[in-house]
Design a protein with these regions (language model features):
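Structural motif corresponding to alpha-helix initiation and N-cap regions
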Residues: 23, 63-66
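Extended ligand-binding regions for polar small-molecule ligands
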Residues: 27, 31, 107, 111-135
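Beta-alpha-beta core module
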Residues: 1-2, 6-7, 67-115
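A local structural motif
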Residues: 51-60, 94-95
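Secondary-structure junction motif
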Residues: 26, 31-55, 118-122
């Protein structure tokens, strides 16, 4: 079920050489390390969190810890591409989101088994996610 759609953004540290640009292209990103978040060894490409993850990169770092992504962004001038939503508690004051010029849309949603009912905690979680919808 789709919660909302969003245009991809490039997350990078506020002092990154590309940080002052109003928009960033994939070509602009070539010299910098790309960070890909993976949730497990057998993660399906159909449920990848990053758009453009299949586009070749000269330098790519795969991480499974969100804190590590922030540390790599701060220490290596690395970047990741995501929805534009970034929690402040993950060093958010030092990380910025710049729109990506590519003509793509991310669809943010969830999958549940149709034979099961969503728990109360699950409903609360989805209500919290909806607060991030870029309306």
């Amino acid at each position: 079920t789709e919660l909302f759609s969003a245009k991809p953004h490039v997350f990078l540290q506020k002092n990154h050489p590309l940080a002052q640009k109003e928009v960033i292209s994939l070509h602009d990103l070539v010299p910098y390390p790309r960070l890909n978040f993976v949730q497990g060894e057998y993660e399906s490409v159909y449920f990848s969190e990053e758009p453009f993850h299949s586009i070749p990169a000269d330098k790519e770092i795969r991480v499974n810890d969100r804190g590590a992504i922030v540390n790599f962004m701060l220490g290596l001038n690395a970047y990741t591409i995501s929805s534009g939503i970034f929690p402040k508690y993950l060093n958010g004051e030092n990380i910025i989101a710049v729109p990506l010029v590519e003509n793509e849309t991310m669809h943010i949603g969830y999958v549940i088994n149709e034979k099961q009912e969503l728990s109360e905690l699950g409903k609360i979680y989805l209500d919290e996610l909806r607060k991030y919808a870029p309306f």
